[in-house]
Amino acid sequence: MALDGIRMPDGCYADGTWELSVHVTDLNRDVTLRVTGEVHIGGVMLKLVEKLDVKKDWSDHALWWEKKRTWLLKTHWTLDKCGIQADAKLQFTPQHKLLRLQLPNMKYVKVKVNFSDRVFKAVSDICKTFNIRHPEELSLLKKPRDPTKKKKKKLDDQSEDEALELEGPLIMPGSGSIYSSPGLYSKTMTPTYDAHDGSPLSPTSAWFGDSALSEGNPGILAVSQPVTSPEILAKMFKPQALLDKAKTNQGWLDSSRSLMEQDVKENEALLLRFKYYSFFDLNPKYDAIRINQLYEQAKWALLLEEIECTEEEMMMFAALQYHINKLSIMTSENHLNNSDKEVDEVDAALSDLEITLEGGKTSTILGDITSIPELADYIKVFKPKKLTLKGYKQYWCTFKDTSISCYKSREESSGTPAHQLNLRGCEVTPDVNISGQKFNIKLLIPVAEGMNEIWLRCDNEKQYAHWMAACRLASKGKTMADSSYNLEVQNILSFLKMQHLNPDPQLIPDQITTDVNPECLVSPRYLKKYKSKQITARILEAHQNVAQMSLIEAKMRFIQAWQSLPEFGITHFIARFQGGKREELIGIAYNRLIRMDASTGDAIKTWRFSNMKQWNVNWEIKMVTVEFADEVRLSFICTEVDCKVVHEFIGGYIFLSTRAKDQNESLDEEMFYKLTSGWV
């Protein structure tokens, strides 16, 4: 009698085989295979397809082990090596699945994404589909829940999302030539967009290759979508405090693991966002979609009050939005009439903006590099202390290298200063009110026990621009001899100029006030403070300062102004520091870590990445430890988020700092994983 059909108590048969259960998701069918532990994964899939006997392309399918939350992608590995036994339940499922992506402009698109790829690779493929360069700056985020609202039914959530759905077909990752452009920079790249209005220079079929997107409206991703109704804005989640902002950052996906491993389901809605606030090589010729989506992310951050700005700044941002909305409507009609001469003029005008936004260096010839410029002027200085009513005191201040020396008078400047401030590593915050002629600079200077707070008050815009630019450079360890100093001064002056009120508002024609919708241009805080007519008048006054800008220039100016805000580029996390008893905030920016007061957001202490020796994570107790020069050691536990997210932010910024324009190769994925994945 044959023994091969006799089943033993352990589930194995007498001949050494055992039954493996596989669920085929496409057919919703369970299949049982007789296998041994020596059968490799590829052999299991072959047996499965033969047994199914269904004529179908199975090439995209792979085995997924639900219990272990892992893909079995190494087809040469045996079942024994994978640790699979008779009790394992496997799924045979497509690797590419549908995902609903909310873009930075808040619109949804349906995309097919590889659920078995690491998220970093999946985002790179998504960005190729959308023709967005530098995908390393973006990532995927789970949708934050509004804690102030009761749990809603899924149907209610879906109906809200449908109002923001982009029309058009399913977007598939394509293989057209447009996607083969290098991830970093290439001197041989052909301009893809008109630098004047951001529309494609080539026909859409060539622009998007064979992608399904070419069947719809590819230009939609490069065109700003105005907020259509105040009701949509009112329904959206607005963080009420810094702690709410910090909780939003719980949702960042792990870039080193796949979507399936992180429990992302097919057709789930995820947010595609610029994660790292370090934008490299922004170029209007190639980056119309990238610039527009960056502008949209900045716009929504202001409207939803995710970032603070002054009243004058909000009116300036509203005026730029109004201008961009008007020009976006005109773009499709006027694009064919643009001459090459116009594009050349805009190229020249935008060159400074490109340099500023990418953080690069100018090509201007330096002057005498042996002499470092200095500033010397009367400045009012204030050192706030508890239980004191003393105000600003005027000093003769000289700014040399990265230090400010304060003297009681100009005549005493050859002697010993009354105060000396070393600004290397300090926090620099503007406090400006144009109409009130207030031009203050707040400095938080690192000392052994924390931060010393110093305020500088300037007399006028010109003085403020020079001293503010010098302070910003000094905080990074740079002097006024740096080639970016003059450009920084000009950018500050231009930022202030855009906030000026027009002296003669009667010049605004009555007929154009009707197309301004202030409820969709300013944040709710200012809507509550003023009547709609008052806001409209102020927006139109501010619009006269930007009315001559081209579409792309206006978007670039908006991004640049966003970057100038004190809170820009800081990602917050709730943390408990070693030795501390209460919860505080840790802020991560492109160049530093900031310990912050959870209620006020004030910086308690700052540490620069340039002084960092190493950082590591104790995965058992979830503690992040960062070591700096001078034996400084920082340890904290993240209370509301996996410490892996914080670890990835630090490593991600270190990775981005290694980028250079002379690199022609594609992204070094392995280097990114080494810096961010950790020992999980």
Curated annotation (Swiss-Prot):
The modification Phosphoserine is found at residues 159, 181, 339, 351, 666. It is a peripheral membrane protein. It holds the Pfam family PH. Residues 189-661 form the FERM domain. GO terms for biological process: adherens junction maintenance; cell-matrix adhesion; focal adhesion assembly; integrin activation; integrin-mediated signaling pathway; limb development; negative regulation of fat cell differentiation; negative regulation of vascular permeability. Residues 40-81 are annotated as: Interaction with membranes containing phosphatidylinositol phosphate. It is found in: Cytoplasm; Cytoplasm, Cell cortex; Cytoplasm, Cytoskeleton; Cytoplasm, Cytoskeleton, Stress fiber. Detected in adult heart muscle (at protein level). Detected in heart, skeletal muscle and testis. A 1,2-diacyl-sn-glycero-3-phospho-(1D-myo-inositol-3,4,5-trisphosphate) binds at residue 383. CDD domains: FERM_B-lobe, FERM_F0_KIND2, FERM_F1_KIND2, PH_fermitin. Residues 141-162 are annotated as: Disordered. Keywords: Cell adhesion, Cell junction, Cell membrane, Cell projection, Cell shape, Cytoplasm, Cytoskeleton, Lipid-binding, Membrane, Nucleus, Phosphoprotein, Wnt signaling pathway. One of its GO terms (cellular component) is I band. GO terms for molecular function: actin filament binding; phosphatidylinositol-3,4,5-trisphosphate binding; protein serine/threonine kinase activator activity; protein serine/threonine kinase binding; SMAD binding; type I transforming growth factor beta receptor binding. Residues 380-476 form the PH domain. Disruption phenotype: Complete embryonic lethality at peri-implantation stage, due to severe detachment of the endoderm and epiblast from the basement membrane. Heterozygous mice lacking one copy of Fermt2 show no visible phenotype, but show decreased tumor angiogenesis upon transplantation of tumor cells, and their blood vessels are abnormally leaky. The FERM domain is not correctly detected by PROSITE or Pfam techniques because it contains the insertion of a PH domain. The PH domain binds phospholipids. Binds preferentially phosphatidylinositol-3,4,5-trisphosphate, and has lower affinity for phosphatidylinositol-4,5-bisphosphate. Belongs to the kindlin family. Interacts with ITGB1; the interaction is inhibited in presence of ITGB1BP1. Interacts with FBLIM1. Interacts with active, unphosphorylated CTNNB1. Identified in a complex with CTNNB1 and TCF7L2/TCF4. Interacts with ILK, ITGB1 and ITGB3. Scaffolding protein that enhances integrin activation mediated by TLN1 and/or TLN2, but activates integrins only weakly by itself. Binds to membranes enriched in phosphoinositides. Enhances integrin-mediated cell adhesion onto the extracellular matrix and cell spreading; this requires both its ability to interact with integrins and with phospholipid membranes. Required for the assembly of focal adhesions. Participates in the connection between extracellular matrix adhesion sites and the actin cytoskeleton and also in the orchestration of actin assembly and cell shape modulation. This is Fermitin family homolog 2. It comes from Mus musculus.
